[in-house]
Amino acid sequence: MVSRAPREHSPNPAPGYHPKMTATTPLAVLYADEALVAIDKPAGIAVHRSRLVGHDEEYLIDRARAATGRTLYLAHRLDRATSGVLLLAADRDMAAALGQQFMQHAVHKTYLGVVRGWPEPEGLVDYPLDAPGKPGPKPARTRWRRLATTEVAIPMGRYPQQRYALLVLEPETGRYQQLRRHLHHISHHLVGDTTHG
């Protein structure tokens, strides 16, 4: 039997790494002016109350309001498991204007994701998706571009090694869990996705 000392956590984690948010974790405000606030949303916290997320103890919108002392409104959403920049508006009119820009695809969204396997260097998933409680699937499109690949010489299941790729993901629509579901559809599951992976 081999015993190991507990691993020390690096004081400088990798860029984009977010440990689970707790009630005392400060929010990182990336930008703020009289009309907008941009928050670095960590993975693991729901943006707002909804029937899809159940009854969490806290929500990012409440934390942002408490941290800034301002009434703020969501301009868009990010899934609980997703980290990234979240835009908040200082009033309802600004939130509506930003929401329109997202709906009209005037805002370009880019994500990074590590997937299992090596997909083609670039591609497009054009596959309709439905949402819980909504009638029928709606059009959904996601473009991807492969940035890097790696192979790990550790057997898993029937495979003698594991292959992974880093992708740039650009959703052209904004459907429920679109990126995770589209990656599942092309059999290159997002690493860490416990629902579709």
Regions found by a protein language model. Name each.
Residues 3-4, 11-166, 170, 183-186:
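RNA pseudouridine synthases
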Residues 99, 180, 191:
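A short local structural element in Rossmann-fold oxidoreductases
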Residues 175-183:
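Short beta-strand segments enriched for Tyr within beta-sheet-rich domains
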Residues 183-197:
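Phosphate/ribose-recognition catalytic cores of enzymes acting on nucleotide-derived substrates
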